[in-house]
Swiss-Prot record:
This is Apolipoprotein A-IV. PANTHER family: APOLIPOPROTEIN (PTHR18976), APOLIPOPROTEIN A-IV (PTHR18976:SF1). GO terms for cellular component: chylomicron; extracellular vesicle; high-density lipoprotein particle; low-density lipoprotein particle; very-low-density lipoprotein particle. It comes from Mirounga angustirostris (Northern elephant seal). SUPFAM superfamilies: Apolipoprotein A-I (SSF58113).
Length: 382
């Protein structure tokens, strides 16, 4: 299933120009999750992978495109299969090699920082405090924005439901003709308001990435005087830290979007029920409209409750990652399993590069037939 998913993803992007539908990040996640689950060698984990939301999402997309998939040439399919297999095989081979490289890097970095161990620990602690000060307002602002825009969504939809109730009372004789436009508009309003909600909330993740870059750069500068002989190794570790922290920001963004989509999925069926009741008697329709209003209240409140802790949870995760860096660089760190984050970062960089190559090829040669498209696999390590 893994190879089929990756091959079809890359085929879809290469041939149909569907970069907007299937991203490099999605493909990298499929490959990385598969590698991680097989590395754990747990039957339950592999079963979970097969049922994961991402796999279902990609499979659904491919089913929609199955007619196009069947038209791909054997030559292109072979190239893409080769690339997908190479990704996974290189992950497996590079894992142990990179693990040893990171172990040696940390060993040399700790030795270089050892004469200044107390100062280094204090500087990292100061950085954690600064990070906490930077992130605190964002967590509170996210909570405020969630409450504000969720309330706006509820008010918009409740007002629409109330207009339907008023119309119902005034047009008892011709309910279907009077209320059908309102029922159709209700679904459109749900879609519109949920999209606006996502539009207001998801940019926070991008703003947090900027703060992460600022914080990591501040940390690099503060530690530079103590790492003159091992600066390159320190920079590499800080790159890994920034990658992990930004991954948390992406996960926050995905959670916000997923919660908003879940809210939509819970609201739309109720609107459809109301539309279906237009053929019923007035009493049944009044009951449905009353249930609609209470359902709106419950679902919006549940959304607010679910979203409430996200900001604080995100902040704690970032602070914990900086604390883990402090422990890694300390004199008593011992062996640390730290190579996987670097391996994942390298994988995502290479998949992004592969997608960029496809996009450039497509832009430069839009009229070239599909069989003439040449793809060059991008190795995981240069």
């Amino acid at each position: 299933m893994f190879l089929k998913a990756v091959v079809l993803t890359l085929s879809l992007v290469a041939v149909t120009g569907a970069q907007a539908e299937v991203s490099a990040n999605q493909v990298a996640t499929v490959v990385w999750d598969y590698f991680s689950q097989l590395s754990n060698n747990a039957k339950e984990a592999v079963e979970h992978l097969q049922k994961s939301e991402l796999t279902q999402q990609l499979n659904a997309l491919f089913q929609d495109k199955i007619g196009q998939v069947n038209t791909y040439t054997d030559n292109l399919q072979k190239k893409l299969v080769s690339f997908a297999m190479e990704l996974h095989e290189r992950l497996r081979k590079d894992s142990e090699k990179l693990k040893e490289e990171i172990r040696k890097e940390l060993e040399e970095l700790r030795a270089g920082l050892l004469p200044h161990a107390d100062e280094v620990s204090r500087k990292i602690g100061d950085n954690m405090h600064e990070l906490q000060q930077r992130l605190g307002p964002y967590a509170e602002e996210l909570r405020t924005q969630v409450n504000t825009h969720a309330e706006h969504l509820r008010n918009q939809l409740t007002a629409h439901a109330q207009r339907m109730e008023t119309t119902l009372r005034q047009n008892v004789g011709n309910l279907q003709a009077s209320l059908t436009p309102y029922a159709d508009e209700l679904k459109a309003k749900i879609d519109q308001n949920v999209e606006e909600l996502k539009g207001h909330l998801t940019p926070y993740a991008d703003e947090l990435k900027v703060k992460i870059d600022q914080n990591v750069e501040d940390l690099r500068r503060s530690l530079a005087p103590y790492a003159q002989d091992v600066q390159e190794k320190l920079n590499h570790q800080l790159e890994g830290l920034a990658f992990q922290m930004k991954k948390n920001a992406e996960e926050l963004k995905a959670k916000i979007s997923a919660n908003a989509d879940e809210l939509r999925q819970k609201l739309v069926p109720v609107a459809e029920v109301v539309r279906g009741k237009l053929r019923d008697n007035t009493e049944e329709l009044q009951k449905s409209l009353a249930e609609l209003s209470s359902h709106l209240d419950r679902q919006v409140e549940e959304f607010r409750r679910n979203m409430g802790p996200y900001g604080e949870t995100f902040n704690k995760a970032l602070l914990q990652q900086v604390e883990e860096l402090r422990q890694k660089l300390g004199p008593y760190a011992g062996d640390v399993e730290d190579h996987l984050s670097f391996l994942e970062k390298d994988l995502r960089d290479k998949v992004n590069s592969f997608f960029s190559t496809l996009e450039e090829k497509e832009n430069q040669d839009m009229l070239v037939a599909v069989p003439e498209l040449q793809l060059t696999p991008v190795p995981l390590e240069s």
